[in-house]
Curated annotation (Swiss-Prot):
It is an enzyme of class 2 (transferase). It is found in: Cytoplasm. It catalyses: [ThiI sulfur-carrier protein]-S-sulfanyl-L-cysteine + a uridine in tRNA + 2 reduced [2Fe-2S]-[ferredoxin] + ATP + H(+) = [ThiI sulfur-carrier protein]-L-cysteine + a 4-thiouridine in tRNA + 2 oxidized [2Fe-2S]-[ferredoxin] + AMP + diphosphate; [ThiS sulfur-carrier protein]-C-terminal Gly-Gly-AMP + S-sulfanyl-L-cysteinyl-[cysteine desulfurase] + AH2 = [ThiS sulfur-carrier protein]-C-terminal-Gly-aminoethanethioate + L-cysteinyl-[cysteine desulfurase] + A + AMP + 2 H(+). InterPro entries: Rossmann-like_a/b/a_fold, ThiI_AANH, ThiI_fer, ThiI_N, THUMP_dom, THUMP_ThiI, tRNA_STrfase, tRNA_sulfurtransferase_ThiI. ATP binds at residues 183-184, 208-209, 265, 287, 296. One of its GO terms (cellular component) is cytosol. This is Probable tRNA sulfurtransferase. The lineage of its organism: Bacteria, Bacillati, Bacillota, Bacilli, Lactobacillales. SUPFAM superfamilies: Adenine nucleotide alpha hydrolases-like (SSF52402), THUMP domain-like (SSF143437). Keywords: ATP-binding, Cytoplasm, Nucleotide-binding, RNA-binding, Thiamine biosynthesis, Transferase, tRNA-binding. Residues 60-165 form the THUMP domain. GO terms for biological process: thiamine biosynthetic process; thiamine diphosphate biosynthetic process; thiazole biosynthetic process; tRNA 4-thiouridine biosynthesis. Belongs to the ThiI family.
Length: 404
């Protein structure tokens, strides 16, 4: 027998009351986005489950993709069949025969939501267990901690049989907690921050600052590929490229070296906030980790934050660098993040940046700039690209091959 579908069990959605179906429908849409590379599959949801019909597609890559989607508590490859006792008996016998080995223990666990079905749960357990003994007389039944728990569900539309339960990513479906703008440089920390924001249901749009010719096409492709990795957790992400060359040159030419980083970050924050307002976001997300670099001391954060009243979410703010690296490796962004392309945060970096910048000094130095004009020109020059889940090739590897 081949699996018919993957049955997805919802996570925290069961606690969402009147909004439950909104959360479930969002999860369904996210699953459809993530599984877009598999055109044969079909997705439908009800209040208790989401069903991914395989329609002949190999189940293993579908399972691997679904395991990453936020809002999925658990999933099981299942056999779907008509609600017929003879069909159930044959299916259970075939499945257990294929799984059997010496010393194997099992139990049948039936759940019947269709109360019009001819047998109740206890009767089905007894009947199907007896059917297994008919073909496997040496097998042992065990009610506590068996090797195999064969789950049989009798629902209104069909019967379902499964024996695997695979842990999902948990969290909330992406898009159920509003929209935020993720400041993504291309380093290790910001993709991890984006991942953690996605886990709590935030619909992120990625804001990436590019300063050609100081930053290369490779740096831009790297940021887009990091964004593509994040699409695996909840579907498509809008990637917003911000032209930043003019501003960085202005800062380099007119500001004291010690304040280059502070002023650069203040401009980035202003621009991100303007894009957030334009695109109806609610928060800004970044990868700042307290004390990790000069721009991430409390004094620096205070001086940079002063340009906006928008809430700033910093998911990795209390994490050690090693913890962030381990999470980046776990979510498969680390190898991309360490590719040697310079970004806006590394070009023009001063040798001795100010670790305790004064807000008054930053504001005084900014009097040398046409702040509104610079911000307006940057925002009007943004390029928005929809990033969809990757299908086959790692685009960064392809880019490197092309450059060599």
């Amino acid at each position: 027998m081949d699996y018919s579908e993957i049955m997805v069990r919802h996570g925290e959605l069961s606690t969402k009351g009147k909004n439950r179906m909104r959360f479930i429908n969002k999860l369904k849409n996210n699953i459809q986005d993530v599984l877009a590379p598999f055109p044969a599959i079909a997705v439908r949801s009800d209040r208790d489950r989401t069903h991914v019909s395989l329609n002949g597609t190999d189940y293993q890559p579908i399972v691997e993709a679904l395991k990453l989607v936020f809002g999925v508590q658990a999933l099981s490859p299942v056999y779907k069949l008509e609600k017929s006792v003879p069909l159930l008996v044959t299916a259970v016998q075939d499945i257990m025969t294929s799984l059997y080995r010496d010393g194997l223990t099992f139990k049948i666990a039936t759940k019947r939501s269709d109360h019009a079905f001819e047998l109740d749960s206890r009767e089905l357990n007894s009947l199907l267990g007896g059917a297994v003994f008919e073909v496997l007389p040496n097998i042992q039944a065990q009610m506590k901690h068996p090797d195999v728990t064969l789950k049989v569900e009798i629902r209104d539309e069909a019967a379902y049989i499964s024996y695997e339960e695979i842990k999902g990513a948990g969290g909330l479906p992406v898009g159920t907690s509003g929209k935020g703008m993720l400041m993504l440089s291309g380093g290790i920390d910001s993709p991890v921050a984006g991942y953690l924001a996605l886990k709590r249901g935030l619909d992120i749009e990625v804001v990436h600052f590019a300063s050609p010719p100081y930053t290369s096409p490779g740096a831009l492709a790297k940021a887009q590929d990091l964004t593509r990795r994040l699409t695996r957790f909840g579907g498509n992400i809008q990637f917003i490229e911000v032209p930043f060359t003019e501003i960085q040159e202005e800062i380099k030419n007119k500001a004291p070296e010690a304040y280059l980083m502070t002023l650069t970050r203040r401009f980035m924050m202003r621009i991100t906030d303007a894009i957030r307002e334009q695109r109806k976001g609610l928060v800004i997300v970044n990868g700042e980790s307290l004390g990790q670099v000069a721009s991430q001391t409390l004094e620096s954060m205070q001086a940079i934050n002063a340009v906006t009243s928008t809430p700033i979410i910093r998911p990795v703010v209390t994490m050690d660098k090693l913890e962030i690296i381990e999470m980046a490796q776990a979510i498969d962004t680390f190898d991309i993040s360490i590719q040697p392309f310079e970004d806006c945060c590394t070009i023009f970096a001063p040798d001795r940046p100010k670790t305790n910048p004064k807000l008054g000094n930053a504001e005084k130095y900014e009097e040398r700039f046409d702040i509104d004009g610079l911000v307006q020109r940057a925002v009007s020059g943004i390029v928005v690209t929809k990033i969809t889940p990757e299908i086959v090739n790692d685009e960064v590897e392809n880019l490197i091959d092309a450059l060599l």
